[in-house]
Amino acid sequence: MTNIRKTHPLMKIVNSSFIDLPAPSNISSWWNFGSLLGICLIAQILTGLFLAMHYTSDTMTAFSSVTHICRDVNYGWLIRYLHANGASMFFICLFLHVGRGLYYGSYLYLETWNIGVLLLFAVMATAFMGYVLPWGQMSFWGATVITNLLSAIPYIGTNLVEWIWGGFSVDKATLTRFFAFHFILPFVVAALAGVHLLFLHETGSNNPSGLNSDTDKVPFHPYYTIKDILGVLIMITVLSSLVLFSPDMLGDPDNYIPANPLNTPPHIKPEWYFLFAYAILRSIPNKLGGVLALVLSILILMLIPFLHTAKQRSMMFRPMSQCMFWILVADLFTLTWIGGQPVEHPFVVIGQLASVIYFLMILLIMPITSMIENQLSKW
């Protein structure tokens, strides 16, 4: 008799995705981040659900309701900080996952890659709206500054901003709709992640060598289930250490001051995971130019498959490209640092240089480096 996991309509899907899935025998720990992102998403949806039970999306009570969660709800402080720092873990895993894709040429699976970029956009939108909900100073001013950027769109800009705000400034209507969107978007992300996996399983996973691995596959379970569980345990250790020892390390102290439209914080800045994009936005003195650069800094990922000039897929055997890749990583760290600094000399110039290097690396330097490597290896 055939095993039930291979015949039952629902279990068959689980079986072909997580149990009998043929996986390359040599995928490294860099391939763990997909499963970690899945765990992060589930954790965020669950903690978010419990927070939503006690949260009120009204400008008069939002800040107080978050205080109430932390003080009066059983383990409310734990749920709140797991949710806030869980977002940071989510983005750490996202950036490493994207970095892995860039390094090993996984972007050549076009559908999987493009849906991944859409996922990145959706998660960033969710995180932005979630940051507005506690209705602290940084929540309010962050929402004001970022939504205001849309006014740079010619002709419809001002109307668009007021439509999003639901009035003439960020107020009750804005908070209520942001809460609604923040609640629904993670489920959209979950659906997109399902499609992401669907397309991935059409081709199978890439591997560190970038070569076809059809001749050497192993079943996903038990090999990679065990490997993924180790990754999950490490992530839980890091997250719980962060939550239990220094829950506010990655947050902004200004967000413990209730939102006040009459008082602007000295330095308006987003959460750390948006700082690189924020630095690119600020490095251009023109409003529309800055907004375009901000969007392109992520959208440029969709161009990467078309900029692949190398004969080999992975960077594993391409030392010059490796060097360029790590310069790009260092540049992103620089941008993240600059995004958190005030707008003054020398930070402005460093930010502008780092922004130019970011776009030059991806659009010009890395494709040219690959061409040089092709010549050197006598292809």
From Swiss-Prot:
GO cellular component: mitochondrial inner membrane; respiratory chain complex III
Binding annotation for a ubiquinone: 201
Coiled-coil features, chain-numbered ranges: none
Membrane topology qualifier: Multi-pass membrane protein
Binding site for heme b b566: 97, 196
Family annotation (InterPro entries): Cyt_b/b6_C, Cyt_b/b6_C_sf, Cyt_b/b6_N, Cytb/b6-like_sf, Cytochrome_b, Cytochrome_b_C_euk/bac, Cytochrome_b_N_euk/bac, Di-haem_cyt_TM
CDD domains from the UniProt entry: cytochrome_b_C (cd00290), Cytochrome_b_N (cd00284)
Superkingdom of origin organism: Eukaryota
Keywords: Electron transport, Heme, Iron, Membrane, Metal-binding, Mitochondrion, Mitochondrion inner membrane, Respiratory chain, Transmembrane, Transmembrane helix, Transport, Ubiquinone
Transmembrane segments: 33-53, 77-98, 113-133, 178-198, 226-246, 288-308, 320-340, 347-367
Residues annotated for heme b b562 binding in this entry: 83, 182
Further details from the record: Heme 1 (or BL or b562) is low-potential and absorbs at about 562 nm, and heme 2 (or BH or b566) is high-potential and absorbs at about 566 nm.
Assembly with partners or alone: The cytochrome bc1 complex contains 11 subunits: 3 respiratory subunits (MT-CYB, CYC1 and UQCRFS1), 2 core proteins (UQCRC1 and UQCRC2) and 6 low-molecular weight proteins (UQCRH/QCR6, UQCRB/QCR7, UQCRQ/QCR8, UQCR10/QCR9, UQCR11/QCR10 and a cleavage product of UQCRFS1). This cytochrome bc1 complex then forms a dimer.
Entry function: Component of the ubiquinol-cytochrome c reductase complex (complex III or cytochrome b-c1 complex) that is part of the mitochondrial respiratory chain. The b-c1 complex mediates electron transfer from ubiquinol to cytochrome c. Contributes to the generation of a proton gradient across the mitochondrial membrane that is then used for ATP synthesis.
Name of this chain's protein: Cytochrome b
Biological source species: Crocidura orii (Amami shrew)
